[in-house]
């Protein structure tokens, strides 16, 4: 007997919904309401930081039992994405912990002060992420615009799986950044998943998916009744 999948739309197009949550509290509701993947954070008020070891351990165990993949945010603080050596070491340590716990994926990004990818830091972090999917998070939106195509190429060359992007500053409504996101999707040309987020919610998710021609989207409020 076929299981009911509430991510089916008319025409049998599936929307794959990644829900960003803060700590464990909302995870059971998100799973119950059809989340396809969870991005686990602490402190969403600053865009998400690394959750505690205890939260990660229990959330990962719960989600493994439910067969829902989890992506852990690896970010030692709010603010910019320019990290010093000590912060990179902290992130490496968190990545090794994630590996031990069987986390499915990790989200991180490191930039230089002049708005480019910090290649040395990223190579260290990627090396510490063996066996897990890698997401370059919204640090992408803080790159200098002229550097974004080269950044996509670099991330493809380093086997990064997805780029999470709002297509511009988070203060700009996503309806006004869709053209930028479409440009990144077209340039990526299937080499890496471009994951739209930041302002995607249960009311606009279908329209955004259709406009961009994507099947995978990210948001805190992407499912009705979770975080809203």
Residue ranges of predicted features:
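Catalytic cores of alpha/beta
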Residues: 22-32, 82-95, 141-158, 184, ...
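Active-site-adjacent beta->alpha loops and helix N-cap segments on the catalytic face
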Residues: 25, 44-64, 112-130, 143-150, ...
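Glycine/small-residue-rich loop that forms an oxyanion/phosphate-binding "nest" at active or ligand-binding sites
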Residues: 52-60, 65-117
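Hydrophobic faces of well-ordered beta-strands that scaffold small-molecule active sites
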Residues: 17-21, 38-40, 70-74, 106-108, ...
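N-terminal pre-domain/capping segments
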Residues: 14-36, 43-50
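Acidic (Asp/Glu)-rich catalytic clusters
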Residues: 31-32, 56-69, 96-100, 123-129, ...
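Glycine-rich phosphate-binding active-site loops on the catalytic face of alpha/beta enzymes
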Residues: 36-48, 97, 101-114, 160-173, ...
